[in-house]
Amino acid sequence: MDLLSGTYIFAVLLACVVFHSGAQEKNYTIREEMPENVLIGDLLKDLNLSLIPNKSLTTAMQFKLVYKTGDVPLIRIEEDTGEIFTTGARIDREKLCAGIPRDEHCFYEVEVAILPDEIFRLVKIRFLIEDINDNAPLFPATVINISIPENSAINSKYTLPAAVDPDVGTNGVQNYELIKSQNIFGLDVIETPEGDKMPQLIVQKELDREEKDTYVMKVKVEDGGFPQRSSTAILQVSVTDTNDNHPVFKETEIEVSIPENAPVGTSVTQLHATDADIGENAKIHFSFSNLVSNIARRLFHLNATTGLITIKEPLDREETPNHKLLVLASDGGLMPARAMVLVNVTDVNDNVPSIDIRYIVNPVNDTVVLSENIPLNTKIALITVTDKDADHNGRVTCFTDHEIPFRLRPVFSNQFLLETAAYLDYESTKEYAIKLLAADAGKPPLNQSAMLFIKVKDENDNAPVFTQSFVTVSIPENNSPGIQLTKVSATDADSGPNAEINYLLGPDAPPEFSLDRRTGMLTVVKKLDREKEDKYLFTILAKDNGVPPLTSNVTVFVSIIDQNDNSPVFTHNEYNFYVPENLPRHGTVGLITVTDPDYGDNSAVTLSILDENDDFTIDSQTGVIRPNISFDREKQESYTFYVKAEDGGRVSRSSSAKVTINVVDVNDNKPVFIVPPSNYSYELVLPSTNPGTVVFQVMAVDNDTGMNAEVRYSIVGGNTRDLFAIDQETGNITLMEKCDVTDLGLHRVLVKANDLGQPDSLFSVVIVNLFVNESVTNATLINELVRKSTEAPVTPNTEIADVSSPTSDYVKILVAAVAGTITVVVVIFITAVVRCRQAPHLKAAQKNKQNSEWATPNPENRQMIMMKKRKKKKKHSPKNLLLNFVTIEETKADDVDSDGNRVTLDLPIDLEEQTMGKYNWVTTPTTFKPDSPDLARHYKSASPQPAFQIQPETPLNSKHHIIQELPLDNTFVACDSISKCSSSSSDPYSVSDCGYPVTTFEVPVSVHTRPPMKEVVRSCTPMKESTTMEIWIHPQPQRKSEGKVAGKSQRRVTFHLPEGSQESSSDGGLGDHDAGSLTSTSHGLPLGYPQEEYFDRATPSNRTEGDGNSDPESTFIPGLKKAAEITVQPTVEEASDNCTQECLIYGHSDACWMPASLDHSSSSQAQASALCHSPPLSQASTQHHSPPVTQTIALCHSPPVTQTIALCHSPPPIQVSALHHSPPLVQATALHHSPPSAQASALCYSPPLAQAAAISHSSPLPQVIALHRSQAQSSVSLQQGWVQGADGLCSVDQGVQGSATSQFYTMSERLHPSDDSIKVIPLTTFTPRQQARPSRGDSPVMEEHPL
């Protein structure tokens, strides 16, 4: 489409929009007194008519000013261009709008007709006449006289006559000014409610009539126009005698209404005013104010004496509808009273409507000549009817007296367009005399008439006219050909050959019809089918024989009546529906759609199920099938029935269709793993396995069918190094890379199995535990590792965004868990690094302390000593708690006074069975000074604990680790060629290369006597009530160089343990660091200590995180039963024989106490003896005299257990020299005759293991395997001097006698972080086999040791 065509279409559309209403209004603003030929506006542009091309019009566009004959318009318009100009007529606003209120706008209106007829519109143009300042304000008189009494108070105000300005707005009165007032008077201007400005004279000084009785000055008034206009008047003020009172109107505002036809002399209103004066001053005079208009003064009369207002001349509402009468009441004084009377003139139907004919088509001798072929709606004249009356009296209608081919169409209020309503025909009517009638709505109505003459010019312009403008016929379908439908006819107003008509089918007529040219008969020539075509719409033409011929047409609508000649049709011959088996009863199965080409009742189809099938129902109207049963695919997979469709014809037709309903499976089952059967199974993967080898196959089944049962596998967690891959269809897990050392251990691979169900896939996950190792030597440990590992979250793969659920909530939970795990690991790592850096170096000054004496016990400390402990509540309650009480008794035999008295120190110990392994020994401080020796080694042991029973009286809230502090002169640590520690130093604290900074705590200590026992009792079965074992130890004699008298001392250790701890151990191995915490029943450590966090892989020169001494977070479980006792009291001879080289160098355990100073040369002399509560040794290895042992673990609080052999209760089940739960143990541990390294041993409850052999006089075994505690063995009591060995009972040498002093001590809680002191509590010492002296009042007699 080119630009010109687009412009044309746009112009036509715009013209349709512009002229759709038939009339428009356009407003312009002009100023009064404008000169001639001033351009006001351009209708062609202002009405957007310039977009209409002239070539689309029959004639050129024309603008014609429509005005009343005889009027002189104030504007003119160019007919070709539409430009509006002023004429020579004066535009005077004050004259044109003299009768309207001053606050209303002044308009001048004209009408413009836009021709030709195809775009004809009548435009009413309203000119808003703006006021100019062409009038000056004037006072009502040039001299204004006013009287003021001489007693007027200062600031008294007197109203002056106001000036009048015909202009409005700012051009009106704006300001008053007093000239030459001599400062006696001032002027103020107030504004009345009507908006008028009133001047008031103000008395500014006292007046004295005798001094001066007259003042003359000028008053000036100004308007606000530009240029400003003003006028002046002389103001003469007379000073009069005093007039005390002023008149007062009874009513200051009065509003009355009076009809405009009221006769002259009719009373309008009566004013009343009063004056309190008497005499002449009381006489009141009424008058109109000078603000009252001249018209009001002419129409109304005011009685000056009575105040009665009457009609002076006839009123005319059409001239002035209301009048404002300002009445003044004066008593001769200078302060008249004011009252406003508003007179509303009501309308009376006293005006006849007037008819104003303004021709659009120019008349010739007052007659309009029209051609008979002019188009319809040709505009002839604008008829304006007016009535000066108001309301319904001024509402006028206009009409013609009889039927004529013309009509009046309203365009504006009381304005009508006279236009042709039909084609004119010269042959029928040559002239028209149109009588126009105008009538108002008054009662009675008044009317007016006017005549308008039209003459018709003859032309051949009449076309045939059909008698019907629209022809409608109906015929049933399946008709016989040749049936006549209807006959059309047309007439022609012309005469002669122009009136002869021929009938023709229009070009849109279908071939099924034919038309007789002369008669106009319409006939059907073919059989009709409503289903193919239900209606026909075409035209019939009528053509005359004139020259040129004229034609007309009529539209024919043929409707085909339906017959029931079609049966209902199903959209499918057979319907197959698939429904889920969980579809509820009365749910929607499907929809049967049926169509019927017929119409009405013939197409109203009703559906039903044949054969009385009660399992399903069908909606007879909508075709929705619903079940009356619940589906079960396993019972019946499909249902078949027939549906009947029947229409509603008089002779109904029907059809049927087969319906099959198939019950399909629903994805309501998750895949279930059958391999592995649970998260606790595992598979061994050899490190030598080649990449690409299938190491395991997972298998999951889905109880659904089809795609819902198709399972796909994927690894979604645990495979952080991508060591394994899985086949998503077979479930084969393949090793992707060659395993190295870092890959050894347990791998928890999280495998996800999801089905292919739609729309939602279901899935399950399983943990596949792949144990990368050469063999599985300890299945119990692996099972325990697997069980423990299930409590920790599996690390997700980096590429897996969500392994548990597709929802964002599980993603958030997973991210939070991973972040928390990483945070904990980082904190533990940082803490371990800081603690390791705090390990003190060796202090050489310890060498000077080897010959130090023990601290002298204080015999006065006879009461129980309470020690503070840390109060830290655990976040998670442990599942089981084991409460142990260690009672250390000491008998002094050297002093006669203390004979038979023993001091017993009860130390409560908490043990967690499963949660203890979670305690971090690295981050938990111990009770030792940073540079003190590692005393924890003396109280940690790798020996398993026997089965103990928890008794109700077991105290609550007790710690599960008890550390005995050494005396200031520490004889428990010595230095030689092997040890790096010194036992002699000026420092009051002994120094160990392996010490850790610790936090102290206190425990309660009770002192009581207990008789010694001289036999060794061992229990190999769970203890029912209580079991007591006493081991007497005879320490080695002191070196002669020390010059000390060897005293005899014995040490008694009593264990109070809770009931229920007699579970047997299933595995005696040491825990792997990566294996997770184990239960206390494993007996890897004494008293069921969890092993995984207490010990770690380490070299002999490094401490591990297991070097803590106490667990401040231990808790107790209420409901404990009576405690059992195990008392170990060796004799002096036994103790001396059982002291080993390690006891002489590194200190003594409870079974082996020695004097303070020991000779280094004795380290090669001592032999270790083992007192145990377990069966004999299971194996002994080849003897080696070179010590391969890299590290030795002692009972209770010892360093890492990674390379340790423990006595009692836990022999290795398979391997001889290594415990299965600790990977580095393969290099462990042949026992030897030389002392171990600096970190080798600690104080023990049994002899140190470094040189332990079968307890006999034979050479020590090269390897000693921890004795295994068996549930099947019974309790055996051994006589003094005999123990159970590998080959039976072994003799213990009792010939060595020694003297040793023992000392009790406690650990007090630090009062300040810098306080590293260890408080030593002196207690009474005793000698073994010395009888205790009688006590006084149940309290043993204590005496201080002579040393």
Curated annotation (Swiss-Prot):
Glycan-modified residues: N27, N48, N54, N344, N553, N773
Record membrane topology: Single-pass type I membrane protein
InterPro entries xrefs: Cadherin-like_dom, Cadherin-like_sf, Cadherin_CS, Cadherin_N, Protocadherin, Protocadherin/Cadherin-CA
Pfam families, per database record: Cadherin, Cadherin_2, Protocadherin
GO annotation terms (biological process): cell adhesion; homophilic cell adhesion via plasma membrane adhesion molecules
Single Gene Ontology MF annotation: calcium ion binding
Localization per record: Cell membrane
Annotated signal peptide: 1-23
Residue ranges of domain Cadherin in the record: 26-139, 140-249, 250-355, 362-466, 467-570, 571-673, 677-795
Keyword Cell division carried by entry: no
SUPFAM superfamilies membership: Cadherin-like (SSF49313)
Keywords, sorted A to Z: Calcium, Cell adhesion, Cell membrane, Glycoprotein, Membrane, Repeat, Signal, Transmembrane, Transmembrane helix
Major subcellular location class: membrane
Extracellular face of the membrane: 24-812
Cellular component aspect of the GO annotation: plasma membrane
Cytoplasmic topology ranges: 834-1347
Keyword set includes Repeat: yes
TM annotation in the entry: 813-833
Region named Disordered: 1057-1091, 1097-1116, 1325-1347
Summary of the function given for this chain in its UniProt record: Potential calcium-dependent cell-adhesion protein.
Protein name: Protocadherin-11 X-linked
Species for this entry: Pan troglodytes
